[in-house]
Amino acid sequence: MAEKRDYYEVLEVTKESTVEEIKKAYRKKAIQYHPDKNPGDKEAEEKFKEAAEAYDVLSNPDKRARYDQFGHAGMSGAAGNGGPFGGFSGGMSMDDIFSMFGDIFGGHSGGGFGGGFGGFGGFGGGGSQQRKFRGSDLRVKVKLNLKEISTGVEKKFKLKKYIPCSHCHGTGAEGNSGSETCPTCKGSGSVIRNQQTILGTMQTRTTCPTCNGEGKIIKDKCKVCGGEGIEYGEEVVTVKIPAGVAEGMQLSMGGKGNAGKHNGIPGDLLILVEEEPHPELIRDENDLVYNLLLSFPTAAIGGAVEIPTIDGKVKVKIEAGTQPGKVLRLRGKGLPSVNGYGTGDLLVNVSVYVPETLSKEEKSTLEKLEESKNFKPSTSIKEKIFKKFRSLFD
């Protein structure tokens, strides 16, 4: 799909929908487009993935908040794979989607739902509930200057984290010993416990204590990782930061966190954006603000001054009689919206410099000018200044 659809549109829900309503909508879409029900249908498979991606974001309060504020740019993509931050192409396979589906609805995890669409019987809670371990998230900070924010930028991070064990390739087993079905849960990953109550016998399904929900146990543990399937290592990750990001915004890159045990689901890489202060410009959302200090003669007779922008200095014409407090607007010289909807402006706040000391000649000149009616504020000017002052308290 060339252009990403709105996640709410994908699941046919609204921004006011609850998590339960979103879960219900996802379940409906997953049943409709599940590969077992649509064998060989690539379009259905893509819609199945699309629905899973939408659910992954909208069911998570943090991801949903970022998406509501910044759209798809808030879940921005990783350089090189084109996948979405927090999406599936960055680190989740179809198996992972199936596993997530099983976790949500009590279905079977793995390469499918068990030899045909009937595997969806897990919805009732009676199916197997094999568990996949998810690795923990990693958090990093990235400091950006206004130039980088205005254009977007790629940043490389050298991450020290848990990766799949190089000796056992993440299985946790030594050599070809592999694993065997858990004798306690018979491979289901869960056990049923009976409890006598005043209402009779109550049955509850819980995670198997022997295999921790995996449905299998390792016969001969890897001598390098001790059967965990992970080891400490390094990875260099390139992150594409979209233009228009702001201080405090958190991006997430799916699948680039710590590896999950036994080839489980990797965690996410969370990137917290920090802004470097600019020596002359101040950010106000997508606008930039510059405080211009004019000399009195320039304000009175006009002229041209250089104004700093992100892309260098530009000359701006100053009209004769420019008053302190006037705001000049340079359209399109601000920052782009992270959603891609327009660009802010550069606002130039004008102040007039009054010298603190004067020579005798300068003082004499000003005393002569003071007698001119042009140097005496008119009633209309006084009223204008008073209205501006009063508006500060409204």
From Swiss-Prot:
Residues 6-71 form the J domain. Participates actively in the response to hyperosmotic and heat shock by preventing the aggregation of stress-denatured proteins and by disaggregating proteins, also in an autonomous, DnaK-independent fashion. Unfolded proteins bind initially to DnaJ; upon interaction with the DnaJ-bound protein, DnaK hydrolyzes its bound ATP, resulting in the formation of a stable complex. GrpE releases ADP from DnaK; ATP binding to DnaK triggers the release of the substrate protein, thus completing the reaction cycle. It is found in: Cytoplasm. Homodimer. One of its GO terms (molecular function) is heat shock protein binding. Its main location: cytoplasm. It comes from the Bacteria. CXXCXGXG motif repeats lie at residues 165-172, 182-189, 208-215, 222-229. Zn(2+) 1 binds at C165, C168, C222, C225. Belongs to the DnaJ family. GO terms for cellular component: cytoplasm. Zn(2+) 2 binds at C182, C185, C208, C211. This is Chaperone protein DnaJ. The J domain is necessary and sufficient to stimulate DnaK ATPase activity. Zinc center 1 plays an important role in the autonomous, DnaK-independent chaperone activity of DnaJ. Zinc center 2 is essential for interaction with DnaK and for DnaJ activity. InterPro entries: DnaJ, DnaJ_C, DnaJ_domain, DnaJ_domain_CS, HSP40/DnaJ_pept-bd, HSP_DnaJ_Cys-rich_dom, HSP_DnaJ_Cys-rich_dom_sf, J_dom_sf. PANTHER family: CHAPERONE PROTEIN DNAJ, DNAJ HOMOLOG 1, MITOCHONDRIAL-RELATED. One of its GO terms (biological process) is DNA replication. Keywords: Chaperone, Cytoplasm, DNA replication, Metal-binding, Repeat, Stress response, Zinc, Zinc-finger. The gene is dnaJ. Binds 2 Zn(2+) ions per monomer. Its cofactor is Zn(2+). NCBIfam families: DnaJ_bact, PRK10767.1, PRK14289.1. A zinc finger (CR-type) spans 152-234.
